Amino acid sequence: MLYTDQDDPVLIDRTGRRTLAVTDPRTHCIWLAKGLHGRSLERVLLHELGHATLVSYGMLPELHRMVRPAYWTEAEEWICNLLADYGAMIFWKASDQLGYDILEWQPPYARDGIA
């Protein structure tokens, strides 16, 4: 993860829009705008980690198989927004139902890290 100024061209995404963060699959780097903090930083980071996970674990071809090419970017953004907006709640509710913190356990693939 690298922080950069909000007006840095690196924060222009593949659609040509200026964003608060960008994941670059070629360099395996997440770029975040300086000044993000609190819940905004959490949401943006979770969203970008969603992109990194899709790329690192080779999930994009599967997504592309299920979605028409015109909607590939929109579908990827939807998945990353789902993770950012509801991911923590899902784990909290599962932990509550099971009676223990499920985040204490790490699946083997999570130990390898996200490229």
Regions found by a protein language model. Give the residues of each.
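Metalloprotease/metallohydrolase-associated module, dominated by Zn2+-dependent proteases
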Residues: 1-39, 58-115
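Active-site recognition of the HExxH zinc-binding catalytic motif
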Residues: 43-55
